[in-house]
Amino acid sequence: TIINVKCTSPKQCLPPCKAQFGQSAGAKCMNGKCKCYPH
């Protein structure tokens, strides 16, 4: 799931992804935007 959060590294995406999808969510930075992987 791509969320509307800008990023330069996956670490920046983990907090918003965890907030939206739970503590076990994973995150990547793709094309300057965060992509969350719910688990």
From Swiss-Prot:
Gene3D superfamilies: Knottin, scorpion toxin-like
Disulfide bonds: 7-29, 13-34, 17-36
PROSITE patterns in alphabetical order: SCORP_SHORT_TOXIN (PS01138)
Localization of this protein: Secreted
GO molecular function, one term: ion channel inhibitor activity
Keyword annotations of the record: Disulfide bond, Ion channel impairing toxin, Neurotoxin, Potassium channel impairing toxin, Secreted, Toxin, Voltage-gated potassium channel impairing toxin
Residue span of region Interaction with Kv1.3 channels: 37-39
Lineage top rank: taxon: Eukaryota
Residues marked Basic residue of the functional dyad (site): 28
Any Pfam family the entry gives: Toxin_2
Signal sequence interval, chain numbering: none
Presence of the UniProt keyword Membrane in the record: no
InterPro entries the record matches: Scorpion_toxin-like_sf, Scorpion_toxinS_K_inh
Coiled-coil portions: none
GO cellular component: extracellular region
Free-text tissue specificity from the UniProt record: Expressed by the venom gland.
Swiss-Prot/TrEMBL site (Aromatic residue of the functional dyad) positions: 37
Annotated family: Belongs to the short scorpion toxin superfamily. Potassium channel inhibitor family. Alpha-KTx 02 subfamily.
Entry domain remark: Has the structural arrangement of an alpha-helix connected to a beta-sheet by disulfide bonds (CSalpha/beta).
Function of the molecule: Potent inhibitor of voltage-gated potassium channels such as Kv1.1/KCNA1 (IC(50)=0.144 nM), Kv1.2/KCNA2 (IC(50)=0.675 nM), Kv1.3/KCNA3 (IC(50)=0.23 nM) and Shaker (Kd=160 nM). Suppresses expression of the Kv1.3/KCNA3 channel in lipopolysaccharide (LPS)-stimulated mouse macrophages. Down-regulates secretion of nitric oxide (NO) and inflammatory cytokines, such as TNF-alpha/TNF, IL-1beta/IL1B and IL6, in LPS-stimulated mouse macrophages in a manner dependent on Kv1.3/KCNA3 channel blockage. Reduces activation of MAPK and NF-kappa-B signaling pathways in LPS-stimulated mouse macrophages.
Name of the featured protein: Potassium channel toxin alpha-KTx 2.2
